[in-house]
UniProtKB/Swiss-Prot annotation:
InterPro entries named in the record: Peptide_deformylase, Peptide_deformylase_sf
Binding site for Fe cation: C108, H150, H154
Protein name: Peptide deformylase 2
Taxonomic source organism: Nitrosomonas europaea (strain ATCC 19718 / CIP 103999 / KCTC 2705 / NBRC 14298)
Superkingdom of source: Bacteria
Catalytic activity: N-terminal N-formyl-L-methionyl-[peptide] + H2O = N-terminal L-methionyl-[peptide] + formate
An annotated Gene Ontology molecular function: peptide deformylase activity
């Protein structure tokens, strides 16, 4: 039987597995699928986590949900550190407590070049499973709390622009269509 990888080794593993995954772009309907629970941490899940981390770092981004790479399982990778060496893996995450409200500027790898303000909880407590298969709880505030909530929205089929007014959503959609036409030309 293969031993689960310790949480700290995931970032090391990413240095050797170099699979960059395709990130879905808003308004792709697959971004609205609700992710399912991960029943167990298998070799395939470890490989997916490694590939997601590599994709996130290469993009570059600070968080990525499996939904964004068209895998509809409850998996998130995050690294908000300045040194980009503190990978956090959350499998089957759930927010069990939250407090405060803060409006922050957000962007998304699935909505490239678009940034806007969203109000979220200032602090959250999350329960999740790590890549080692062990359950844990953690408190998060600031950018980490925002990132966790943003990525968990993806697992529920929601993209951050859906918090914005219909007018802003329409303008964003127009801008993204223009970007897509420029890339084709």
């Amino acid at each position: 039987m293969i031993e689960p990888l310790p949480r700290i080794l995931v970032s090391e593993l990413c240095k050797f597995v170099m699979a960059i995954l395709n990130i879905l772009r808003y308004p792709d309907e697959r971004l609205h699928k609700i992710a399912t629970e991960v029943p167990s941490i298998t070799r395939e899940i470890r490989t997916l986590v490694s590939n997601m981390a590599e994709t996130m770092y290469a993009a570059p981004g600070i968080g990525l949900a499996a939904t964004q790479v068209d895998v509809h399982q409850r998996i998130i990778v995050i690294d908000v550190s300045e040194t980009r060496d503190e990978l956090l893996v959350l499998i089957n995450p759930e927010i069990i407590a939250s407090s405060g409200n803060a409006e922050t500027q957000e962007g998304c790898l699935s909505v490239p070049g678009i940034f806007d303000k969203v109000t979220r909880a200032e602090e959250v407590t999350v329960r999740a499973t790590g890549i080692d298969g062990k359950s844990f709880e953690m408190d998060a505030s600031g950018l980490l709390a925002v990132c966790i909530q943003h990525e968990m929205d993806h697992l529920m089929g929601k993209v951050f622009v859906e918090y914005l007014s219909p007018f802003k959503q329409s303008r964003i959609l127009s801008k993204l269509k223009k970007q897509a036409r420029r890339q084709i030309a």
